């Protein structure tokens, strides 16, 4: 699974939290100063890589998640475990419990 950019994660977090939505509805939740095309590009890329999908019958498109938040987090944790702890889950667990 592809690691998302901060902006892509921001969009996904909102859709996971609030459910399916249009690009226009995302803009005020992210940043009113961003142009429609900026958010639209992020959403279309998420659609292209399989994180989002949409219904083609209606305009504006209503985008909904194809990847659950839980699955994405699981993949992130696995990736960190592999990259930094040689897949040793015990070392990983120790690292995140150190205060």
Give each language-model segment a name.
Residues 2, 15-19, 67:
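Short helix-capping/hinge SLiMs at alpha-helix to coil transitions
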Residues 2-7, 20, 86:
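Short helix-coil-helix linker/hinge
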Residues 3-7, 57-77:
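Short, cationic-aromatic polyanion-contact patches
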Residues 9-14, 25:
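Pre-recognition alpha-helix immediately N-terminal to the DNA-recognition helix
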Residues 20-30:
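Short acidic, hydrophobic short linear motifs in intrinsically disordered regions
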Residues 33-45:
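Short amphipathic alpha-helical interaction segments
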Residues 75-99:
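Amphipathic alpha-helical dimerization/coiled-coil segments
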């Amino acid at each position: 699974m592809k690691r998302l950019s901060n902006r892509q994660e921001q969009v996904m977090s909102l859709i996971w939290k609030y459910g399916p939505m249009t690009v226009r509805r995302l803009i005020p939740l992210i940043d009113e100063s961003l142009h429609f095309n900026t958010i639209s590009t992020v959403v279309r890329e998420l659609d292209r890589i399989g994180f989002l999908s949409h219904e083609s019958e209606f305009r504006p498109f209503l985008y909904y998640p194809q990847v659950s938040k839980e699955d994405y987090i699981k993949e992130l944790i696995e990736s960190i475990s592999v990259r930094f702890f040689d897949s040793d889950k015990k070392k990983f667990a120790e690292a995140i419990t150190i205060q």
